Amino acid sequence: MSGEDLTNLNKIEHIVVLMMENRSFDHLLGYLALEGGRTDVDGLTSDMFNISTNGTVHRIHHLENTTFELDPCHEGNGVDEQISNNNGGFVLNFERMCRPVDPGGVMGYHNAADLPVYDHLAREFTICDRWFSS
């Protein structure tokens, strides 16, 4: 940090961290890289997919509405399955836990038009695209 950077730290009065429970970064803000063209965001890319047990390829896709009826598993074993194989287990876990729903639904995302308040916050403030917690 330069001396000027350290001086500017005195101007900061508050730090607010907004964490969204049970939503992934890609689900809510991944579009910033895909549709928003931001190269500074580790978000979605057009080549992302997961495969279900019957071999169906489920690609990322824009969700039709902002209501997600089912809740993917959040227990330790479920999360382990989801992130195993280079994050390739999301559809498999969702398919197993939420039958008979379309397992590809878990590969959906929202965009700026769906979530204008989040979009505004993401464009005006710092976002943490590599935030991990347990």
Region spans (language model):
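N-terminal pro-sequences and low-complexity stem/linker regions of secreted or lumenal proteins
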Residues: M1-S134
